């Protein structure tokens, strides 16, 4: 969180794509802590008049169904609370597709990043 204030103080930032959670989720950080961190970033960006798009993530069931339910609810909740555009799942259409991921099966390859970039561009075009 210390980096958020510093990073968002750079001149010329008009818009951020706010996506946080995959690594927090994989490390088992509780959804309420992830939500607080995201909300703090939203407040900092809003105070600087920076536009925001929320890039959602979904949790697998490896941490249990309660964790998944709570984690998956974070992004729509913040989008609604702050009236921000939402990409429900940033990796939609990319996750689990071997043609769109690196050999590790987790990280998008060049083709996968193009799909993600197009999704982001569509949201930007529709909202800003």
PLM regions and their residue ranges:
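Alpha-helical cap/lid subdomain in secreted, periplasmic
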Residues: 1-128
């Amino acid at each position: 969180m210390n980096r958020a204030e510093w990073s968002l103080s750079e001149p010329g930032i008009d818009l951020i794509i706010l996506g946080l959670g995959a690594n927090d989720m994989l490390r088992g950080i509780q959804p309420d802590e992830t939500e607080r961190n995201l909300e703090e970033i939203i407040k900092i960006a809003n105070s600087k008049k920076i536009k925001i798009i929320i890039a959602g993530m979904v949790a697998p069931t490896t941490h249990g169904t309660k964790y998944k339910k709570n984690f998956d609810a974070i992004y729509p909740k913040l989008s609604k609370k702050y009236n921000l555009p939402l990409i429900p799942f940033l990796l939609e259409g990319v996750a689990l597709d071997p043609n769109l991921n690196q050999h590790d099966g987790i990280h998008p390859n060049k083709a996968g990043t193009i799909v993600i970039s197009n999704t982001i561009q569509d949201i930007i075009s529709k909202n800003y």
